[in-house]
Amino acid sequence: MIHAYNKSYLSAAQKNLARMLDYLVNDLHYPLETAWQWFVTSELSARFEQGDCSVLVGLSGVELARAVLEQAGEVVPMQKPSYAYDRSPEYWTGWALAYYQWLTSLRFAEIKQAVSITKVRLLYTPYHEMDVRQFADKMNELYRAAKPETNLKAMRTLAGLSQSELAGQADVPVRTIQQYEQRQKDINKAQAETLLRLARALNCNVEDLMEKVPPLNFK
């Protein structure tokens, strides 16, 4: 699995996203859903998930929160953050989501579309007491339940093509397309030439066809 960025930045990234959510929700009293929506739709979110060091480690969590507010067109308060002895559920939510995004390389918007921030927050008990990898396994399960079809099928449907039409345009056997869509074959292990042909026919990037979350039933 290809991770979003170098692991050496992960710990700082987790702490900063955690502090950002904690500050916005518990110090500034914004709803969790609103705070997360502001972040996900901001330019900072894209830079974060791509491993931009100036965002991952160049800003503190509070500075990140203030930058998100500024991009959302909100008043940016100078209120000092509180530092509770116990980490809040919102802090854990940001911390865990940063790990999951790094692990899968999914965009935060993709995660949000499949699993709402409220649902992630509800995983605080019992997952905050477990290894974060167990949280990631649960997120994979929720993601796949919300998005059972492959990216190839989703892109083909979006393009309005049948399997046979895609096979003809991409010069790829229809049986191969069926096997990828049914997860009988792992598209991540497909030959580069096959992926390029499919991507050209679907007018998308090769990355758009790759599966970043392991299927629940793939052997």
Regions found by a protein language model. Name each.
Residues 53, 172-188:
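Recognition helix of helix-turn-helix/homeodomain-like DNA-binding domains
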Residues 210-219:
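Short, charged recognition helix plus adjacent turn
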Residues 162, 173-176, 191, 205:
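Short coil turns linking two alpha-helices in DNA-binding domains
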Residues 152, 163-167, 177-180, 209:
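Conserved hydrophobic/aromatic packing and binding residues within compact polymer-binding modules
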